[in-house]
């Protein structure tokens, strides 16, 4: 996923994209001005109504049309990965350019129509067929952290299942969303004659979200975002598939290979400056493993900051609010060098991640901070590590990671934390099929229990029974 682009390559990509933004191919300052024939609408109600028409057209095209739409989205996303990744990086100003590009290049791994196969049973009393049928129009909320990747992944899953979709993207990534959705729709219309299969609000607001959620044209909602938007979706009155917040803990014990554990944690936690919801957010290491493990962190691209620097950074990142801590957004997804300067330190431009020793109640441990600064908590033993990890995970039931060669300990942590995603002896990204087995998705429905989404997530099971006939034996 990491392209290892050098600084000159990064500058060239950004310069090229900014030039296009300033020229005839630029995204407009008000995305709603895009032609509605490209699926971009000024409000939620009109976008939902148009998507309903797009759904009707898709139904006429059958599974072949679904398959072609999936192929269009995958091929366009991969072929435009450098330009679109740079566009999103320039718009959102968070994460790492090479990882923005990488997230788009791997969209081809998202499962499509091949996942939608019926189940059939035959017996003395006839036959039964169960099919995975579409809902119709799905309303989708997408985050600023992964604007185009989440949109592309959602489209692939949802259209493969036979649905249309209307997006209310995060305002911070709306230009990227509009650019990609407009391009997809143009190619879908050119090749299939289907219009408005993928719709989007060009000026997304709370009001446009509410209009989508309340629209009679929308059957279900799919939410990828923080606790606030998930809570709102739960009150919409519609079935909601919610990919909520996480704060993934890591346990490293004395049986683990310290170098491999350090390298894996850096690979997962530093990816896109730790914007991934599955990314390693806090580490609990046993006393017996601590020295060797932290030495390997330093040897492999992470840099330790002092307690004084940590205090200064903490004051920049968090504010006390309602008896707890609230995250200030200014440093979310920023490079470790930016974080170091905020902490009053200077570090190598090659540094991938910062780390600091903290106690288990430090705000960097308890709050999901989404930046490449990982707190390391030294604990007496594995039992203490599990208790602390469970507290830090906050019952989000999202993701957790362990580095250990003790299978009993792996099992204990998995049972206690009860997360949707649990990775053993690998980077967090292995949980989505990147260096591990399985399939890719950018929406992990933790809050509502569907898990890592795939086309079947967006279907309803329908049963058809024939009594006394058609069983041919």
Predicted regions, residues:
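Rossmann-like NAD(P) dinucleotide-binding subdomain of oxidoreductase/dehydrogenase enzymes
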Residues: 118-260
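Structural signal for hydrophobic packing residues in well-ordered secondary-structure cores
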Residues: 18-25, 52-62, 73-81, 85-88, ...
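Terminal low-complexity tails and localization/encapsulation signals of metabolic enzymes
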Residues: 2-35, 126-136, 336, 423, ...
